Amino acid sequence: MAETFTEQLTKKVAEADEAEANEQTGNAIKLYEQVIKEAAKEPEDLTEDAIKAKEVATYKLANIYKEKGLVNELIDLQKSILPLFIDFPKSKTAKIMRSLFDLTLKLDGHEQ
């Protein structure tokens, strides 16, 4: 039986977590990016758990960028996730954007 969209996303997040724990940051970044960019084939594929997996991947990727001081990548992440928000509840969208904005402001290399 084929994996569902949600199972695929959840599996990739787990793989990325493992890569990050093993200090394979480059691999973790790629996997988190794949989760964020992966589009649902059908609207019903975008379950609450699939949205949660994308949200978790976004936060974890943002934290990697913050830890590494990658200001431009963090700003680009904010721009690249905008298409996701079509499917997200407005409250979740606001929370994610506020969190990413706050992370960006906390970076040392960010000019205000």
Give the residues covered by each predicted segment.
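Extended alpha-helical scaffold regions
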Residues: 1-112
